[in-house]
Amino acid sequence: MIDTKLIVAIVVGVWALLFVVMMSIQKKRKSKATDYRASNADKALLHLYGKKFSIDGRDLSLFETVSGENLEKIVALPEGSHRIAGVYQSTEVSALGQNINLESEKVEFDAELEKGHSYSVAMYAYSPEERREYYKGDVPRDVLSIPLTLVKGSEDVKAYIIVYQDNVGEGEAS
């Protein structure tokens, strides 16, 4: 019969090996994202959270992108107005502590992007004003906010697609 200590030692050994491999993969991903940001400092960096994205009518797979944290996709775009379309996803925690996965239908909008800035486009269960109040004003500047409802034409807003400009320069209002 196999000794219990041997089984525990094997499990711990496999866990340690997998831990080292996953840490190495994570470090390479972070390094790649950092290099991508540095090499595209003269463009607008767009961080997208969701799936099935297209920019200016072209599928996101046609652009050079990198994956960031939390399944974000980072794409560098030239300065100017861009048409962004996609299905946005988010996870919220209910009052009972259960995770609720939110997913929008395809949402399409135009956004004006400036070079040298980083933008996050994501779905939130709260408005930019509610977030600003909660964090006592310590939030990025919201460039665009699109309220989403469960029923078309309803006044009962359930979520927002928000474009935040993450790195507002010194002296600019946030």
Give the residues covered by each predicted segment.
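Short loop/turn and low-complexity linker motifs enriched in small/turn-promoting residues
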Residues: 1-76, 87-174
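A short tyrosine-centered beta-strand micro-motif
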Residues: 80-84
